[in-house]
Amino acid sequence: GSGGKINYERYFAPEELDGIYTPVHRPDSVGAAPLEGRNVVVFVMESMSAEHSAHLHPELYADRQVKGYTPFLDSPMQAGYCFERMYANGTRSIQALPAVLGSIPSFKTPFVLMPQALAPTRQLPRILRDKGYATAFFCGSAAGSMGFGAYARSAGIERLYSREDYEARHGRDDFDGYWGIWDEPFLQYAGEEMSALPEPFFAALFTLSSHHPFVVPDAYRDLLPEGLTRNHKCVAYTDNAFRRFFARYAGEE
């Protein structure tokens, strides 16, 4: 329950368990390019699935006119590293950040609603902050939505950017009427703010336009493929939002 009590069971001493199995893998090489001091940006995409991608599932689109709903995102998958069997244990939006940024499994009560979420934890943002990174989190929903604010602070994130921050600069015309700011303008805003962060920085961004009730801006209603489900058009909208984001910011160091 939300009381948050977790029973701690100890079956092995840490050194004994390491001798049996360790999930820590230390590669001999991290690749040709040095990674230390690089900016790190993690995009968490609402309701995205491998089945939306013609690159990941070409067999689904072999006989269809529409070749997937993520034509832009398919491009960096082909040009960069793409891990096809990488999973995070979160099944709902509220569980996404602890799963992706902290490798925290899903409990009966979402982690962000548990008292333990308020205590400092060694998650990716805090690890990088301890190495001198500025840390930020972007989401176009209201600041207190789904406990993200309290969670982000406990995870080591210093600065949160929300719907309120966007509207303070750009007004209220881009509110989708349900969850927050449409992905396209919010991604552009996030890029502006990331450009002003001290380097090196870590930033996480959570999209929202592909969430139920699956609506897109009027200007895009007739420009995007209908798809087989209501979500497909929203996925195509967010994919295009990323296209515009990378077109503007991909060349920045």
Predicted regions and their residues:
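Soluble catalytic regions of membrane-associated enzymes that act on cell-envelope
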Residues: 1-253
